């Protein structure tokens, strides 16, 4: 049985614009409008899941979707870095930031290691391998990156290679035994 999975990164927040590690913050006004514009493309889902954060709940609302919330789709826990800018962390904790970026099994901020995010997301993907139908998952850039590297069987160290923007849409399909990335083209 074929399963289609559509990943949607939440809309833009102040943290996105200001290059900060996010808190549980709302979408900005422009993000709500942009999200509503893509809603017609996502109305035909058999199952909808979302991270329980405010920004993903607001994205789901703007899309007109009613998700089941899953902690497995939550953003990385950035520990004491939450709410702080990357520039600030670079200035105050350059060694810790470098370690976190280079060694995915480390969490010098006291939160969650990138490797732990990848393990969590891989388990969620595995549970839906044979689900069938169309699944929509509204989540965060870190979760979508983890899903991509899991699908490609890439090492966790490649986590930073994918750049996921707000409202990015990533498609995957499963034939029941493995996930594949799916790139859509324009239809004639």
Language-model regions, residue ranges each:
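Generic beta-sheet signal
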Residues: 5, 133-142
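A polyampholytic, Gly/Pro-enriched intrinsically disordered region
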Residues: 87-101, 178-188
